């Protein structure tokens, strides 16, 4: 037997429970198979997807078996849930490629490889939905629901009520495909629970309806978690300049990923370390208490960023991110700056001014006065001279003390970058092409 009461209390304390249908206490009182869906329309997940797999990992820790269901078939339809417009459709080849990429990422979050009975499996709903013809659909799926039931769903009503929009029949039928997924997994894999975000609650419950009508069973359940927002009401999952934070190192560097977490507010860090990590709750309370003693040290943010970066990338990438942070924003030296990889440098400089110049100007050398004048906050050469005389200007972390100095190509980081620094925090990145 599994202590389902303890599990559900932990879900609540971590903020991982929003809506519930069915008897969750009974379903999770013994080892149970559950499923979580993922969308293969892209080749990488982003941080907005992490909560699904945090929840799945927690359930797996208690002895339950996860099915990660790739929506290969439904991706070719488009989910209308709380979207203002339809999704673009994708090809079978794209679905296959994206599914492989997603599995590689998810494998870091939940266990697919152990010898335990509850190791995760990954399935693609195209395996059963893709084989179904119209006659099969009418007999096996369409008869299990009514138009009235579907019209009452909030996601459908929102699209229908938007002037000039409407909803295609293809998208309208999406929820029946998701409902049939639950029915199929219930019959073939003994799956008794679907988990998802709050915006998926309507689609989750139609699966329960299908199981009840097709099999006369009412022992399945659905569990959803609240949508994640920041304390200030802004959307979670994007950087300060509005970019998605991806799990793929090619799309978002580990340095930028680390910075995303370490820059969270105190209030958000307290919530996110409960939601996104499996650090025991009593330890988290101790960490929060320690953080509150000296919030300016950002202890909690650093611990959250460490956990998430090690989880999604690796301890090695975490150490590189820490080193890059110390070099760029701490007391790094010119020699240390030269060791930073290009992706970390560009990620760190993402929000600063950039100046593109010809590499030829460094062949015979460029004066430090001219370089200082390239800085975003140095409007003239006279200001550049004053800045240098006051020891307020650095190139590649090295103070410039002689206004007659010149800089040649040997000083370029990675053969093409110069980091201009005014004071302690004002940077401009020179890119030589």
Predicted regions, residues:
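NTP-dependent nucleotidyl-transfer catalytic core
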Residues: 1-200, 205-208, 215-221
């Amino acid at each position: 037997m599994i202590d389902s009461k303890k599990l559900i209390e932990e879900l609540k304390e971590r903020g991982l429970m929003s809506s519930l249908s069915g008897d969750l206490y009974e379903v999770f009182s013994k080892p149970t198979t559950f499923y979580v869906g993922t969308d293969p329309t892209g080749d990488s997940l982003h941080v907005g997807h992490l909560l699904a797999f945090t929840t799945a990992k927690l359930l797996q820790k208690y002895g339950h078996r996860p099915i990660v269901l790739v929506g290969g078939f439904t991706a070719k339809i488009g989910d209308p849930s709380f979207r203002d417009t339809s999704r673009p459709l994708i090809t079978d080849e794209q679905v296959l490629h994206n599914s492989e990429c997603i599995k590689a990422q998810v494998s870091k979050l939940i266990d697919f490889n152990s010898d335990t009975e509850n190791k995760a499996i990954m399935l693609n709903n195209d395996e059963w939905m893709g084989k179904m013809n119209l006659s099969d659909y009418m007999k096996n799926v369409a008869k299990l629901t009514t138009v009235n039931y579907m019209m009452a769903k909030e996601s459908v009503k929102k699209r229908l009520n938007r002037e000039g929009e409407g909803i295609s029949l293809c998208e309208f039928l999406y929820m029946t495909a998701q409902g049939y997924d639950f029915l199929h997994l219930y019959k073939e894999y003994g799956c008794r629970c679907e988990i998802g975000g709050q915006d998926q609650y309507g689609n989750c419950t139609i699966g329960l309806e299908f199981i009840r009508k097709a099999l006369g069973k009412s022992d399945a359940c659905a569990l959803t978690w609240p949508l994640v927002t920041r304390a200030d009401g802004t959307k979670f999952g994007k950087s300060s300049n509005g970019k998605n934070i991806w799990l793929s190192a090619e799309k978002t560097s580990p340095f930028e990923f680390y910075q995303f977490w370490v820059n969270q507010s105190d209030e958000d860090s307290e919530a996110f370390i409960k939601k996104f990590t499996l650090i025991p709750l009593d330890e988290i309370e101790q960490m929060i208490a320690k953080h509150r003693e000296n919030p300016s040290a950002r202890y909690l943010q650093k611990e959250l960023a460490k956990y998430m970066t090690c989880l999604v990338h690796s301890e090695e990438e975490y150490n590189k991110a820490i080193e890059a942070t110390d070099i760029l924003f701490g007391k790094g030296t010119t020699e240390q700056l030269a060791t930073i990889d290009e992706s970390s440098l560009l990620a760190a400089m993402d929000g600063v001014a950039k100046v593109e110049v010809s590499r030829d100007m460094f062949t015979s050398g460029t004066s430090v006065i001219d370089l200082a004048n390239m800085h975003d906050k140095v409007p003239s050469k006279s200001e550049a001279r004053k800045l240098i005389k006051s020891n307020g200007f650095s190139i590649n972390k090295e103070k410039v003390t002689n206004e007659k100095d010149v800089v040649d190509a040997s000083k370029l980081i990675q053969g093409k970058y110069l980091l201009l620094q005014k004071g302690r925090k004002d940077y401009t990145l020179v890119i030589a092409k």
